[in-house]
Amino acid sequence: MAKVAHDRGHDVVLWGTWLDDPMLDPVERGEEHPRLRLRLPGLRLARAGDLARALEGAELVVCGVNSDGIVEVLRRAAPSLPDVPIVSVTKGLLEGSAKRAERIDLVVGETLGRDPRFVHAAGPAKAMEVARGVLTWMCFAGRDAESAKAALGGGHLLVSTTDDIAGAELCSALKNAYATGLGMWDGFVGAEAHNARAACFAQAIAEMRALVVAAGGRADTVHGPAGVGDLHVTAAAGRNRAFGERIGRGEPAVEVARDMGAKGQLTEGYAAIASAHRFARERGVADLPLLGAIHAVVWAGADVGATLRDLRFG
């Protein structure tokens, strides 16, 4: 998103957390970003200790910190954070003050002690493709969504807006859990089982819709880029799918998680399965056979073959 903003003509400061020096060092030397494999000329860089300087004069803040770190980063930023929209690409659920699984925007509001003017950026948007100018359709959700769209949308980045921040955030959080399950299904039945994959995908969307509506979101949000679009691209390739595929082929989930974690590849889907299951339980949404099966295999040690063979829905 930093490259998108720069390409739109904005003056951009790219700030890195205390974990991001290996990413910033080559960029500062004029070399390629290690993950994007692109040079990022024209960006001003700021290190972890320069957060206040990075925020000075900002008219828009884009937050790409993962769900484990977003609260701590915004807590540190709070004294210097201007009253401007915060566009978040962070996906997940967090524990709120009521000790329940909650949306990120609600927990961020508690952390900052004020309305954070939060805009959630949802939809299928793989970072490398966005940075390389590949056509991408995103959904910005929140009361400042239009101003965020004006700043970042255009060209290859198509942006629709909605006030349904509950629906958009939940789609983003839930899709990692269901993408892991779809990968698990593919690993179990094989790559040529197209009927089974389609059935599982349709059920995932139905369950996401039930959870979104139960939490006050709208069904139509699930049927757009935030839900169907993001689940499709996440389930097609990537670490969440790979995590599920290995489990589907018979590897114990705990061993796959340990192996991928040791390689720095542990997916958000692992924690997302637990938080999605908790979110559903706390809100009394019970008829979720696919999520129940995914959780049973990944977190309760259920046999993947028996669980998936017994799975029924429709």
Task: Explain the meaning of each model-derived region.
Residues 6, 153, 281:
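Anion (oxyanion) recognition and catalysis
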Residues 1-38, 44-49, 78, 107:
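NAD(P)+-binding Rossmann beta1-loop-alpha1 motif at the extreme N-terminus of oxidoreductases
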